[in-house]
């Protein structure tokens, strides 16, 4: 892992997202980041342009349970309802980790990384590309399948599956 130079320092990498709900694609990025860095703060963020099906507390709980179920270490789950860069500064983070599924993700995330750098000169963004089996996977897709009673067990951890289905089933 990439460690800090001083024994008392811990590099803090933030992996922000809405995680509505968390998927195996998210968990794969979290797992890889946790192997690379001292600590990863998975940050449940609010995006006012994206209506959520689950509350912040539910999403945090889903993440905590999923990280444990998948055996992922070095992870802390938190939430933020403001600007990512404000949280970044308040918690002395040093890197923002973003997952990329496709080139279209890169275009958006690159713009966000540039905006974050403009707001805070020390904000570095590291991009981790998804494994090919997760390039199509999104929380929106999972929710749509669940709403129509489809099987989402290949997309989300078993420990949260029933709660997702219960909330989203329409028929």
Q: What kind of feature is each model-predicted range?
A:
Residues 12, 38-41, 124:
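Residues at the starts of beta-strands that form the adenosine-phosphate
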Residues 13-25:
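Short, glycine-rich nucleotide/cofactor-binding loops
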Residues 23, 63, 149:
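Residue-level signal for inorganic ion chemistry
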Residues 27-84:
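Short, surface-exposed acidic-centric catalytic microdomains
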Residues 60, 79-171:
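Classical nucleotidyltransferase
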């Amino acid at each position: 892992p990439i460690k800090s130079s001083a024994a008392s320092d811990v590099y803090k990498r933030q992996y922000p997202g809405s995680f509505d709900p968390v998927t195996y694609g998210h968990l794969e990025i979290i797992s890889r980041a946790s192997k690379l860095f001292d600590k990863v703060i998975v940050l449940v963020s609010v995006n006012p342009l994206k209506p959520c099906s689950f509350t912040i507390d539910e999403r945090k709980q889903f993440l905590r349970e999923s990280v444990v179920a998948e055996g992922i270490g070095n992870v802390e789950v938190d939430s933020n309802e403001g600007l990512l860069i404000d949280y970044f500064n308040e918690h002395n983070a040093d890197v923002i980790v973003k997952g990329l599924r496709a080139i279209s993700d890169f275009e958006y995330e690159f713009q966000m990384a540039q905006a974050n750098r403009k707001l805070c000169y020390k904000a570095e963004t590291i991009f981790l590309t998804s494994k090919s089996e997760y390039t199509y996977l999104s929380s929106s897709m999972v929710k749509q399948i669940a709403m129509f009673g489809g099987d989402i067990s290949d997309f989300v951890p078993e420990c949260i599956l029933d709660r997702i289905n219960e909330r989203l089933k329409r028929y």
